[in-house]
């Protein structure tokens, strides 16, 4: 059975897409069959981080009735990229019916995948909540800043109230060290659990690094760089492995691959 995992965030600029791309690539290089759905429709940029020229996107499923197989782009590592489309205004305001069509279109890939990673739109929009809740598990990326905490809380609250999603995992990005990352996580967990009946799980952390910024400019995933700092190699590996083992969370609404 394919496991679907949403990578989400309460706000943009916290490293969500970078984490989604690098973890998807890492899992692929370890022998798993992985697809990355860039669900940040209309503003998708996973293909840029992967240096992949795209021909078709999710928009072509909706507008041209293309099969999902014609939208999947193979990358050199074996990762299957499903681009969300960039600069397509129609994709910015998809209604629930079109979101359902996209989710159901991936059913055709269920025998070809082990893991689906979904890079969701930042924030607590209807699209972000629905695509996140359609996954078996949700990972929220936050940074040690009050605004990140506030926006991540708003997203988790929407996910809980609208979709009965009662468990999320957290990755702390741009942390000074492991101790600081866990302190940020503990502080955020206290805020969430004080007001919401949501289980929290610390999935891992990443330090601030010029290598990450450089990999984005170079259009090459950081985990493929031989010169990547050992701490980043270690932490990306741990987060990716934790993603593969993350427990399924029950929620209401439509699910990828009809998983319940």
What are these model-predicted stretches?
Residues 2-40:
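Walker A/P-loop phosphate-binding motif and the immediately C-terminal alpha-helix
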Residues 51-56, 158-159, 186-189, 221-223:
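Short, hinge-like loop/turn segments at secondary-structure boundaries
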Residues 115, 121-204:
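Conserved catalytic-core segment of NTP-binding enzymes
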């Amino acid at each position: 059975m394919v496991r679907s995992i949403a990578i989400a965030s309460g706000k943009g600029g916290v490293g969500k897409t970078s984490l989604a791309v690098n973890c998807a690539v890492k899992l692929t290089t370890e022998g798993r069959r992985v697809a990355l759905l860039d669900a940040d429709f209309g503003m998708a940029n996973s293909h840029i981080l992967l240096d992949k020229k795209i021909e078709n996107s999710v928009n072509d499923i909706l507008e041209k009735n293309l099969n999902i197989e014609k939208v999947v782009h193979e990358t050199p590592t074996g990762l299957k990229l499903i681009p969300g489309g960039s600069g397509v205004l129609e994709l910015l305001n998809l209604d629930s019916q079109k979101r359902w069509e996209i989710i159901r279109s991936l059913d055709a890939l269920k025998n070809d995948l082990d893991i689906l990673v979904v890079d969701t739109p930042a924030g607590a929009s209807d699209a972000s909540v629905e695509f996140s809740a359609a996954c078996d598990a949700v990972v929220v990326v936050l940074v040690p800043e009050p605004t990140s905490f506030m926006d991540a809380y708003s997203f988790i609250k929407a996910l809980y109230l609208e979709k009965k999603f009662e468990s999320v995992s957290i990755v702390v990005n741009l942390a000074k060290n492991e101790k600081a990352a866990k302190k940020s996580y503990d502080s955020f967990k206290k805020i969430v659990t004080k007001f919401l009946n949501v289980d929290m799980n610390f999935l891992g952390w990443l330090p601030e690094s010029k290598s990450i910024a450089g990999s984005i400019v170079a259009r090459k995933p950081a985990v493929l760089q031989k010169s990547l700092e050992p701490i980043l190699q270690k932490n990306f590996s741990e987060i990716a492995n934790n993603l593969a083992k993350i427990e399924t969370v029950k929620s209401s609404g439509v699910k990828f691959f009809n998983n319940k």
